[in-house]
Amino acid sequence: MCLAIPVRIEELLDEQSAVACIGGLRKTINVALLDDLKVGDYVILHVGFALQKLDEAEAQRTLALLAELGRLAEAEQAAQGEAP
């Protein structure tokens, strides 16, 4: 299963690439599909490509939901006696 996730643009390298913060890690991503990006913008990232701009509030809501999903999965594994 593949997910598209919100990431924050930390640095613009050129017209086709940028550095984004993904779960605390910095990674170079392809931004060729989008125009007028600025440092601090949030984008939806899928398999290394920025697909769409996203406002910060929606990005934060989505990231919070993904974090909650991770916590629920860990709790379910613990309840079943599995290691996370």
Swiss-Prot record:
Q: Name one GO molecular function term.
A: carbon dioxide binding
Q: List the disulfide bonds.
A: none
Which branch of life, at top level? Bacteria
Pfam entry (one): HupF_HypC
Report the SUPFAM superfamilies cross-referenced here.
HupF/HypC-like
**PROSITE patterns attached to this UniProt entry:** HUPF_HYPC (PS01097)
Q: Which InterPro entries match?
A: Hydgase_assmbl_chp_CS, Hydrogenase_HupF/HypC
Task: Supply the PANTHER family for this chain.
Answer: HYDROGENASE MATURATION FACTOR HYBG
Which NCBIfam families does the record cross-reference, listed alphabetically?
hypC_hupF (TIGR00074)
Please give the family membership noted in the entry.
Belongs to the HupF/HypC family.
- Entry protein name: Hydrogenase maturation factor HypC
Q: What is the lineage of its organism?
A: Bacteria, Pseudomonadati, Pseudomonadota, Gammaproteobacteria, Pseudomonadales
